[in-house]
Amino acid sequence: MTLLLAAVGATVTALLELTVGPYLRIGTAQPHLVLVVGIVVTVAVGLEAGLIWAFVGGLVLDVLAQRPLGSTAFALLLCMGFTAVLGRLFIRLRPVVPILATLLLSLFYSMTLFVAFNALRTPIVVADPVSILLPGVVYDTALAALIGPLAISIHDRRAESERVDW
């Protein structure tokens, strides 16, 4: 995957998250498509593509949703970096890494956005933000369980295998 393709994919996914995402809402849970697909891209393709995905997707989300510029990109960049570390730690379990990373990082992503929005805008008064965000974590993890292993196995199957050339 070229870096340009990662940037275009992040832009399209950000547009889908802002336009179709509210219609995919289940109760209070709304999917974070840029985060979930970015985690899958980072595990399947590599850190460079994941960082491009996070930066471009975050900026598109910030501009179109009129958020503080750079807040979403910052949260996504942190998540993609941690995903790359998890991908290296569990190299033998690559199809499972997106599920684990999404389970761990979805709440971190949402809380980072919550803290950034409260620091950069008028504070949002919420007694327990974690209980509000947990359904979204479950939803994102379910999406990663559907998308992640399939995308990684397709990517690995299409990758060139190293052979001894006599």
Predicted regions mapped to residue ranges:
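Terminal, non-globular segments
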Residues: 1-166
